[in-house]
């Protein structure tokens, strides 16, 4: 029994370490791609980020479920609100005189495209974490079955 408990502790530690390394690698890869191609500052827009994160939060609260479901719903809500933010930005561009001034279309479109970027980036991170949570739940169920038999 003690050996099984010790083995589980070691495996859980390595599982959490691999999750940490994976998330750091994903974030590093995205930041590296941003830095290699352009100015880092153009990828940050506070209102766009708030729309995506707040929308994802309220989406996960409304959808309900257990912790894994809420985390998965947070990622799904981030993608959906990312696209809603994009559509809102395009509608705002179309309603204003920005279409007439061709010099302003590029920067305005870049800001509008940030919301789907944020949404998918959050979805990737939450997807990795949800998969790990599902894996941990499966391992716990298998361990309980072994202990019962």
Question: For the regions a protein language model found, what residue spans apply to each?
Answer:
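Hydrophobic alpha-helical transmembrane segments of small proteolipidic membrane proteins, enriched
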Residues: 7-137
């Amino acid at each position: 029994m003690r050996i099984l408990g010790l083995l589980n502790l070691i495996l859980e530690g390595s599982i959490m370490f691999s999750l940490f390394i994976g998330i750091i690698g994903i974030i590093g890869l995205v930041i590296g791609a941003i830095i290699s191609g352009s100015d880092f500052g153009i990828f940050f827009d506070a209102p766009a980020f708030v729309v995506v994160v707040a929308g994802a939060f309220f989406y996960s609260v409304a959808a309900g479920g257990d912790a894994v479901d809420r985390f998965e719903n947070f990622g799904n809500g981030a993608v959906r609100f990312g696209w809603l933010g994009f559509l809102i930005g395009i509608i705002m561009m179309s309603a204003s005189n920005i279409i007439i001034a061709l010099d302003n279309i590029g920067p305005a479109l870049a800001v509008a495209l940030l919301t789907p970027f944020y949404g998918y980036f959050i979805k990737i991170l939450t997807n990795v974490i949800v998969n790990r949570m599902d894996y941990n739940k499966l391992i716990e169920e298998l361990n309980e079955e072994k202990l019962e038999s």
